[in-house]
């Protein structure tokens, strides 16, 4: 598939004609919210096999082949040119589709209230073909070792219809915040621990969960080894029951990184104990902080490269946001938090406010600024086809196990287009 960036004066019909496709195909596959008023800088995924590349100054067949993980000989063959051809700037090369590799993908779902809303159920139905796992956030562990379940309306039937594995997410949330005291009890009180693990197995059987995913955050640093031992005991029990075990890890760049979020998460131990880990590689840009990319490529790479020193690549699942933020300027610490927006909403906001979308090459993320009806300045950072492609390239380069999305309900159709175009999503079979 081709990623196209809208330029001044572009129309869908002209773009479709250029790539020998139709406006309907482009509109429907991208679910374009503004087909009659494209935004400069907006990305469009062209639904064609392979893609085209326009030669730039300094390019050679070899350098282009390296960029697209193919060979100069193959590019020469499919484009019917000589291997030693001197490429002219602007010459258009066809890049054939690369072989797909297997990947595991997960998405979190966060229901509110007493049932899963119809909108979230529909999001789960639409995403499930592209997912290995779907996780309902979350089963909240209690101080006595019991569990409070989240709404699960129709999730079992939705996942079973697409052979998607239902993930059971266990948290140390208490009063809507991660609790280190709750964590201390769960990890250190033997009676509570045994009850919790048995409750997890019983609920997994009842609801059809096959992966048990621990998202224990902001634990006390002194509970680091207690958490490791808890996971060893959980793994032994779950594996006997035919269940997988996984964990969510704070985005660390060293074993000695300081901070409440990081210190109790032992990358090496988790890599040895559990079946896979999800690295929470997002929220550099967050609602209470200054405007910036939510998951800039450099910091994401730094976390993964550290993780690779502690565990094998086939246990690492990269976390990825399905959202961005709209900040009101000027940013002031403790002021009005930024508003979460989906990639589709971001495009609509840019269109309504006549804003052009820019792209930060360092962060590999799109952004724009606008002035609202009350004359307040805003800055929006979000995701588009280019930014998610940068993450897919990182997965391929570092040979990671897969990708995990936080969270469904925020529309980003281009992600699923590119995911299915470049990867075979693994579907699990359990005995």
From Swiss-Prot:
SMART domains: Glyco_18, LysM
Function: N-acetylglucosaminidase involved in cortex peptidoglycan degradation during germination. Cleaves only partially degraded spore peptidoglycans. Recognizes muramic acid delta-lactam residues specific to spore peptidoglycans.
Domain GH18 as annotated: residue spans: 103-431
Family statement drawn from the similarity comment of this UniProt entry: Belongs to the glycosyl hydrolase 18 family. Chitinase class II subfamily.
Name of the protein: Cortical fragment-lytic enzyme
Annotated ranges, domain LysM: 2-46, 51-95
Disruption of the gene: reported phenotype: Inactivation of the gene does not impair vegetative growth nor prevent the development of resistance to heat, chloroform and lysozyme. According to Kodama et al, the germination of the mutant spores induced by L-alanine is defective. However Chirakkal et al reported that the mutant shows wild-type germination kinetics in L-alanine.
First-level EC class: hydrolase
Induction: Expression is regulated by the sporulation transcription factor sigma E.
Principal location class: other
Subcellular location: Spore coat
MF GO annotations: chitin binding; hydrolase activity, acting on glycosyl bonds; oligosaccharide binding
GO cellular component: endomembrane system
GO biological process: carbohydrate metabolic process
Organism: Bacillus subtilis (strain 168)
This protein's UniProt keywords: Germination, Glycosidase, Hydrolase, Repeat
Record-listed chitin binding positions: 148-149, 174-177, 218, 280-283, 406
InterPro entries: CFLE_GH18, Chitinase_II/V-like_cat, Chitinase_insertion_sf, Glyco_hydro18_cat, Glycoside_hydrolase_SF, LysM_dom, LysM_dom_sf
